[in-house]
């Protein structure tokens, strides 16, 4: 874990460089945090072990609660063999209206053989006028498993705010043993026709993606097709605007709508089913979601 290098930040600077580096390993029948390093206002708020199998639930927090123009926020997280970590945030993230400078978030996840990482941050709000760049790079070893999502809300819905100024650039890449499985890129500017087009956002305010990679023994088409049909039945019962597809052996779900709570509930339900099918685990939602 050497991607992150220390950046010095003076108290008079108008922006932050915040970086968090975490490592998880399996020891004495549970997952523990074996490595932690942070710079700037980002850290682990709490760790919990609510599951009998010793899964570590970690809550990471960025005290400013959002990313302003000029900020650089970086996460680097690694799970060692047999470790199982669930990572979430205490509340919605925010891309604030810019001061003319671009803001950046970089997420690097490295999942070793026979380990499981669940990356489940709460939604991110894109304020009108934000200039946001987000990059997620996930590297899986051959027998690693992953569940994760990204939820974006355009504007502040409580203020009926639309995204008419600024820009958003998101790049997501998922690799296994240096083979690129998924490359997902999104770019738009405030006021773009794409935001209102039926071929784009269709005037909806919430878009989200869910990604899941099963354990190696469940990657055959027999299991994948069976599990995706069960998930489709779940989505139909919930009556939510979610579509499902398979990209090789990666399960992908997409949400497009106006209610971020419905999105969260749908993705949490999919995650709960996959935990049962793939890992024989209960749903065990992070406790912070209930507060």
Curated annotation (Swiss-Prot):
Location(s) in or outside the cell: Cytoplasm
**Database matches in InterPro entries:** UreD (IPR002669)
Keywords, sorted A to Z: Chaperone, Cytoplasm, Nickel insertion
- Recorded GO terms, molecular function? nickel cation binding
Q: Which GO terms describe its cellular component?
A: cytoplasm
Q: Which Pfam families match?
A: UreD
**What protein family does this chain belong to?**
Belongs to the UreD family.
What task does this protein carry out? Answer: Required for maturation of urease via the functional incorporation of the urease nickel metallocenter.
* Subunit structure, interactors included: UreD, UreF and UreG form a complex that acts as a GTP-hydrolysis-dependent molecular chaperone, activating the urease apoprotein by helping to assemble the nickel containing metallocenter of UreC. The UreE protein probably delivers the nickel.
Q: Kindly provide the name given to this protein in its UniProt entry.
A: Urease accessory protein UreD
Query: Which species?
Result: Acinetobacter baumannii (strain ACICU)
Gene that encodes the chain: ureD
């Amino acid at each position: 874990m050497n991607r992150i290098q220390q950046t010095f930040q003076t108290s008079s600077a108008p922006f932050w460089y915040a970086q968090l580096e975490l490592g998880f390993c399996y020891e004495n029948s549970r997952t523990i945090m074996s490595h932690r390093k942070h710079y700037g206002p980002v850290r682990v708020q709490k760790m919990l072990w609510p599951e009998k199998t010793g899964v570590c639930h970690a809550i990471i927090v960025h005290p400013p609660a959002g990313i302003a123009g000029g900020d650089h926020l970086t996460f680097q997280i690694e799970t060692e063999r047999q470790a199982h970590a669930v990572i979430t945030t205490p509340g919605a993230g925010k891309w604030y209206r810019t001061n003319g400078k671009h803001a950046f978030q970089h997420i690097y996840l490295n999942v070793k053989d026979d380990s499981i990482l669940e990356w489940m941050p709460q939604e991110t709000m894109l304020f009108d006028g934000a200039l946001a760049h987000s990059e997620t790079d996930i590297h899986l070893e051959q027998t690693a498993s992953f569940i994760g999502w990204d939820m974006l809300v355009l504007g502040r819905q409580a203020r009926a705010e639309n995204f008419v100024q600024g820009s958003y650039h998101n790049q997501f890449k998922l690799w296994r043993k240096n083979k690129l499985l998924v490359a997902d890129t999104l770019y738009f500017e405030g006021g773009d026709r794409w935001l209102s087009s039926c071929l784009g956002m269709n005037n909806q305010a919430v878009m989200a993606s869910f990604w899941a990679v099963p354990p190696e023994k469940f990657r055959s088409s027999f299991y994948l097709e069976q599990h995706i049909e069960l998930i489709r039945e779940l989505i139909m019962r919930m009556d939510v605007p979610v579509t499902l597809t398979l990209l090789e052996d990666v399960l992908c779900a997409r949400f497009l709508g106006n209610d971020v709570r419905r999105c969260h509930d749908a993705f949490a339900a999919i995650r709960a089913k996959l935990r049962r099918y793939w890992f024989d685990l209960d749903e065990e939602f992070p406790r912070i979601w209930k507060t």
